Regions:
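Short, aromatic-enriched amphipathic alpha-helices that serve as compact interaction elements
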Residues: 1-16, 24
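Structured beta->alpha junctions
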Residues: 10, 37, 64-66
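Short, well-ordered alpha-helical segments enriched in acidic and aromatic residues
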Residues: 16-28, 32
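A beta-strand edge to alpha-helix "cap/lid" segment located at domain peripheries
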Residues: 1, 46, 50-127
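A short gly/proline-enriched turn/hairpin at secondary-structure junctions
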Residues: 30-39, 52-55
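Short beta-edge strand/loop motif at the mouth of beta-sheet-based domains
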Residues: 37-47
Length: 127
């Protein structure tokens, strides 16, 4: 994976292009949001993000990216803008118009081809 590849992934994610960012996931990818949530499988991750995107606009602003042979590290700021009330959102109730920002460091493990994510771990540290 090159930095341009990773930036294409983030761009597709920001546009809610599920096919575009989903192509970077291995079929059996594991996604962990700290200790709060674990999702296994590309289709389950995409279903999670479809639900999120029905309620929130999520935009990633890259602050730093490091590319290794089998890993990618990312530091980013993510802005969540609530589009419709979501009282039972698992990360805290939110109402239309709310804007939340968090900073995250994420670690991506790559398959043997170096093209698809097999494990994603994200840890939020701000706020």
């Amino acid at each position: 994976m090159t930095e341009d590849d990773f930036r294409a992934y983030v761009d597709a994610f920001n546009r809610a292009d599920f096919d575009g960012f989903g192509r970077f996931y291995a079929d059996d990818v594991v996604f962990e949001l700290g200790s709060r949530k674990r999702i296994e499988g590309r289709e389950n991750i995409l279903a999670f993000y479809r639900q999120v995107r029905a309620h929130l606009d999520e935009h990633i602003e890259l602050r730093g990216v490091l590319i290794g042979a089998r890993n990618v590290a990312m530091y980013c700021r993510t802005t969540f803008t609530t589009l419709v009330d979501w009282p039972d959102y698992e990360f805290g109730a939110t109402v239309k118009g709310d804007v939340r920002e968090v900073e995250t460091i994420a670690w991506y493990e790559l398959d043997e081809s170096g093209k698809r994510f097999t494990h994603i771990r994200g840890g939020r540290f701000k706020p």
